[in-house]
């Protein structure tokens, strides 16, 4: 809500988190980074501080067009900087295209499993832009019906590709599925 729009890096004891407590990994959601100019600044400052302390950064792009409206240039620059600090980049095909401007396969649709090479090429382009990251993950989702999807994933970790083939899953509520994937990546 509205309180979340006012998050500031000053709200957190970054020295304690990163230096004294030894936070091992920082996860940043693109939803929070795009929520308001204040949260964008917060995410940038926290990501910079994490890297300064040697903490790994995971960035889930999580692009939402409504959050970007009227702030496209500002957010593209901020997302580029956070991505350049990230050790792990997570996003679906739309996230990589819309948040980072990386060419990728057509979003959604059927026959997604047959397009895995296009997803790998997209990840390769992301890796070329952000060579300091060590892992890149994307979901593969094919919608069969409102309550039934095929869901899989592709991960490039170092130089090794990992792929989880599409599995048919029953959908009770779509909210949070991508977030759960990003946290596990």
What spans do the regions from the language model cover?
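Conserved phosphate/ATP/ADP-binding segment of small-molecule kinases
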Residues: 53, 66-159
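Surface-exposed amphipathic alpha-helices with a cationic face
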Residues: 44-51, 127
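Glycine/charged-rich beta-loop-alpha catalytic/anionic-binding loops adjacent to active sites
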Residues: 28, 159-170
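Short beta-strand/loop segments at the ligand-binding rim of alpha/beta enzyme cores
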Residues: 54-62
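Structural motif
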Residues: 25-27, 58, 90, 137
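Short, small-residue alpha-helix embedded
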Residues: 172-185
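Conserved phosphate-binding/catalytic loop of the ribokinase/pfkB sugar-kinase fold
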Residues: 1-41
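Surface-exposed cleft-lining segments at the edges of enzyme active sites
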Residues: 29-36, 64-67, 109-111
């Amino acid at each position: 809500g509205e309180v979340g729009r006012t998050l500031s890096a000053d709200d957190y004891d970054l020295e304690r988190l990163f230096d004294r407590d030894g936070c091992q990994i920082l996860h940043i959601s693109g939803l929070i980074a795009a929520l308001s100019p204040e949260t964008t600044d917060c995410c940038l400052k926290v990501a910079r501080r994490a890297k300064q302390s040697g903490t790994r950064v995971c960035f889930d792009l999580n692009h939402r067009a409504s959050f970007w409206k009227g702030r496209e240039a500002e957010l593209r620059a901020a997302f580029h900087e956070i991505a350049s600090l990230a050790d792990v980049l997570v996003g679906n095909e739309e996230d990589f295209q819309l948040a980072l401007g990386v060419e990728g396969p057509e979003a959604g649709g059927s026959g997604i499993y047959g397009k895995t090479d296009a997803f790998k090429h997209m990840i390769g382009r992301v890796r070329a832009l952000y060579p300091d990251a060590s892992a890149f993950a994307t979901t593969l989702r094919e919608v069969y019906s409102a309550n039934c999807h095929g869901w899989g994933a592709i991960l490039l970790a170092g130089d090794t590709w990992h792929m989880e083939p599409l599995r048919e899953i029953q959908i009770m509520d779509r909210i949070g599925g991508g977030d759960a994937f990003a946290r596990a990546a």
